[in-house]
């Protein structure tokens, strides 16, 4: 699959029995968009790993170095806005509304933005590495899987990376409701949770992907 839409389309059409690419906040946004559609009655069968999202720049070495009016290029997904904004807030570049749920926060929830940074969530995720390589914008937010595919190092190349601790964005095995109890699905989740697979993930990705 070349985007984040087709895996759920295939699951809804029963072309596949499960998919493994999305986190709970993204799944919730999909379920909201397809409310009442029985083909989209999906649930998580288990969380497997986290791919910490990174912010990349060829022009600046930290978020605090970004210029006034700096353009931040982001993926076109509402479910990612709070995730990304939390990184900027943690670095002291912006502030969100007090008490807001960071998972569901939106760009409109920014209450302090001294640098007047311009967040532009309108780019398909697979195009973000190319925009970074073309030196577009002042910073580009790239999901780890696309960064890896583009030959980037998601641990050392970004100027800021989200923490893997208490991270709600773990990738999950998604199935139709009720299928999470099927023997084959339970076996799949158990294999992915096994020490052998978790050790392989740690060795292969060296921190770019974190097993849960």
Model-found features: residue ranges?
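Beta->alpha turn/N-cap motifs
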Residues: 3-4, 14, 18-31, 123-125, ...
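Extracytoplasmic/secreted proteins, especially bacterial periplasmic and envelope-associated proteins
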Residues: 6, 10, 15, 25, ...
